[in-house]
Amino acid sequence: MNELWALPFEMAEQVLAELDSAKSNPQALVEGFPERKARGYELVGGVAVIPVSGPIVREQGWYGAGQDAVASSLKAALADPSARAILLDITSPGGVVAGTKELADAIAEARTKKRCAAYANGLCASAAYWLASCTRR
């Protein structure tokens, strides 16, 4: 955790506590926490719903919402002719700064190809808000 994070200070204790709990289940660091794993996207009425749940991290698998998984889901949704629009379903306190600009740029580019929006499904702060704002909806 030697990276700069953009999230509310009070969330730092929660993130650290969850990481500490992984000490008793180190395999979770490799496989990821099942309840937080990205599921790609779900197509609902022609809308690709991409979940962004938990702290935003660089790579999916060990914790939170991986920027790589969100970017991959975004790319797949753009290529899917059944997806007329893209919705980021966000419940996140924010996360790492590194890589967020690149993902934000990808979201901004996506909105030039398909209608994009973000839904703050609870907390949407810091780096998560940055990503949401790139949809402009």
What are these regions (language model features)?
Residues 1-137:
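N-terminal organellar transit peptides
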